Amino acid sequence: MEMISYYAIKSSSDLAKERGTYSSYEGSLWSQGIMPLDSVSIVEQQRGEGYIEVDKSMKMDWDALKKKVKTQGMRNSNVMAIAPTATIANITGLTQSIEPTYSNLFVKSNLSGEFTVINMHLVDALKEIDMWDEVMVYDLKNLNGSLEGINRVPEEIKKLFATSFEVEPKWLIESASRRQKWIDQSQSLNLYISDPNGKKLDVMYRMAWLKGLKTTYYLRSRSATTSEKSTITNLELNAVKSAAQAPEAPSACSILDPDCDACQ
């Protein structure tokens, strides 16, 4: 993220040298040599020591870039933001921007209709260990796209393909905090919580504030009640191959039998 930020700002400054700065550049934070990372210190001064916890480490030469920006200016007043890309991601077969996988198998509805979204990376991983079959599809449907209740799936695959409600919100917030310091605008960060209550929400949003997030986007929670799947029993038996016998053909008379009244 640091590299993307660095070269995005550098490119805007180089464009300013070629085509001129944006109209209100003078007096802006850019004109003062204040980069997104520097704004963390400004927030810390406003709040007081101990009221913001953001990692300030860097690897690139930001002092040189500050001098370039102050000398050449900026072509763009706003350079970076992270937007939600849910539908676009579904169309291209990718995950949503900075989001964890919502579900490994679900049906999405929008103005264009309904379509099924499946995590093809999971499909490939299960094929490698000969576990992608009709039974697995059945289990994923019944468990709302989660692998947690499927005992035959190895733990390492469950961890790798954990869905958004199976990832602790603190990790999403911490990741967002490390991105935010490089972004001059903001990011659309959705938060997920399985069993919401006042205490959990208080802790979660206090942490987001403490970690220097400018904002959050949707808070998504699971419904307190779900419809009962009446055809589901113990999923542990789904992977057991049944010794089903081929059905016997029904008895029927021969069309060549001259004594059959139905064939006359």
List each language-model region with its residue ranges.
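Acidic, low-complexity intrinsically disordered tails
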Residues: S230-Q264
